[in-house]
C-alpha cells in the first residue's frame, strides 16, 4: 500500500504488454498502457485526455498538461518512446480490489531503479489545476 496523505493505495505487480498514444474517434489524444497482472488478469491503464478543446478555434489542441504527462511517463519508466515500455515490470497503484481496481499511477520496481518514485496521475493533473 502507498500512503498518499488521505488515502492508502494498493499496488499490483504487472508486466507491460503494449503501450501507445492514440487519437480517439472524438479526436481526443490519450495514452494507453496495457498490462498483465501477477494474478493473471489484464487491464488497460490510461484513456486520460492529453489535449483540450479550444473554444476560439473550435477544435482540440495540444496542452501543457498533456505534454507533461507524456514526459513524466517516459521519465518514470526510463524509456525514450512508448514502444520501449513493452516487457517492463512495474507497480501499478490504484484503488479498489480485483475487478474494481482503478489504476491511479505507476512506477518501476526498485530493483530496476532504487530511486523509483511513483507517477500518480492526479498529482500531474493538480499541477495544472485540472
Model-assigned labels for residue ranges:
Residues 1-130:
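Short beta-rich binding modules
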Amino acid at each position: 500500500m502507498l500512503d498518499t496523505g488521505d488515502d492508502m493505495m494498493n499496488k499490483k505487480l504487472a508486466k507491460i504488454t503494449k503501450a501507445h498514444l492514440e487519437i480517439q474517434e472524438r479526436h481526443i489524444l490519450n495514452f494507453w498502457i496495457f498490462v498483465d497482472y501477477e494474478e493473471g488478469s489484464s487491464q488497460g491503464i490510461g484513456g486520460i485526455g492529453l489535449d483540450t478543446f479550444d473554444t476560439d478555434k473550435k477544435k482540440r489542441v495540444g496542452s501543457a498538461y498533456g505534454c507533461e504527462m507524456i514526459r513524466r511517463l517516459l521519465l518514470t519508466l526510463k524509456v525514450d518512446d512508448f514502444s520501449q515500455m513493452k516487457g517492463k515490470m512495474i507497480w501499478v497503484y490504484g484503488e479498489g480490489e480485483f475487478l474494481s481496481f482503478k489504476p491511479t499511477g505507476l512506477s518501476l520496481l526498485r530493483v530496476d531503479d532504487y530511486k523509483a518514485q511513483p507517477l500518480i496521475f492526479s498529482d500531474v493533473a493538480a499541477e495544472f489545476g485540472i
